[in-house]
Amino acid sequence: MDHLMLRPVYKVKNLDTLNNIYHSYYRKITTGIKFFVFKKGPLAVGASYLCGFIKSDHHLETPNLQFHVSPASTDFLGKTTLHNFPAFTPTITNLRPTSRGTVEIQSPDTRIAPKIQMNYLSTDEDKEMACKAIKITRNIVMNSKAFKKYEPEELRPGIHIIDNGTLAKEAGKYANTIFHPVSTCRMGNDEMAVVNDKLVAHDLENLRIVDASIMPHITSGNTNAPTVMIAEKAADMIIEDSKS
């Protein structure tokens, strides 16, 4: 399992974004100096300037969508440069996906990479939630007073796309992992489980797995803090076992 981030992009006016800085040689230099001398400016901030959790339906007890907002935009993360116009990306993620991927061993030779199939947006529930998430984002950006002075224009997927089938397909074209893969060595006692409740691998001795892969299900949020907690719990269990 993994969290998939949908990446709608909005062009704006009357607003400076990281796109402007990236395409200005002078501003890149001054931005670098500002960071090295004062530890301030865009380089002192992470990739997301704003994070928030919301509910796709007010009947839900807890939020099921997460925003990561970046004052920059690009076509594909890590493959293309920032756009040459001011824009921002209100990335939104379904925190409870139902799509399941697979990891299959291809050979006894450890030098042969496994076959990894992520299967993003492979269920009707995830496709429906992707459409709902995009429409919620669109409503916030296009209809709220806070954004009005910036005259937002939906560059991607495009304000004209309202059909759910087309919207889910377009949203998936530019989606990316948010780097939360879990559950490949999940804890449990069924035939698909890899470790027991002590994090010891089934049918093996002296082998524990201590990372996000042991989670039976993905968490409704970032996975780093829960993984640290898993490690701390595992450390306690290892110490306790060493005494016996």
Outline where the language-model segments fall.
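Mobile, glycine/GP-rich and aromatic-enriched active-site lid/loop segments adjacent to catalytic centers
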Residues: 68, 133, 148-150
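C-terminal structured subdomain/cap of oxidoreductase catalytic cores
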Residues: 1-14, 88-146, 169-244
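Short, glycine/acidic-rich hinge or "gate" loops at secondary-structure transitions
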Residues: 148-159
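Mid-to-C-terminal "cap/lid" subdomains and adjacent gly/pro-rich loops that border
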Residues: 1-84, 139-146, 161-165, 169-173, ...
